[in-house]
Design a protein with these regions (language model features):
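Divalent metal-cofactor coordination and adjacent catalytic microenvironments
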Residues: 1-91
Length: 91
């Protein structure tokens, strides 16, 4: 995910908290790999990765304002699907 894409997801202008947003973007691939087993190299091929990345980014960025229960349930469901998809890559 690029900084521009992240700013669009978060509905913020570039230049506002760019360092924070970039650090969250940088954390996404390894977080997804750790929680699902889907290697970073395989994440590019999975459309759900972009969706769950946007949701995670929203949850992390707006931690004190996000509707945590509904958003967390959605994120957890998508991470479970990606875990199943990771098994296809891992054999």
């Amino acid at each position: 995910m690029t900084l521009t894409e992240a700013c669009n997801v978060l509905h913020v202008d570039e230049g506002n908290n760019d360092e924070l947003i970039q650090s969250l973007i940088d954390a996404l691939p390894s977080y997804i790999a750790t929680t699902t087993g889907l290697a970073e190299v395989n994440q590019v091929a999975e459309p759900l990765v972009k969706t769950v990345s946007g949701l995670l980014l929203t949850q992390w960025y707006y931690a004190d304002h996000a509707d945590d229960q509904a958003l967390s349930r959605t994120i957890n469901s998508l991470l479970k699907v990606l875990t199943v998809r990771a098994r296809a890559y891992n054999g």
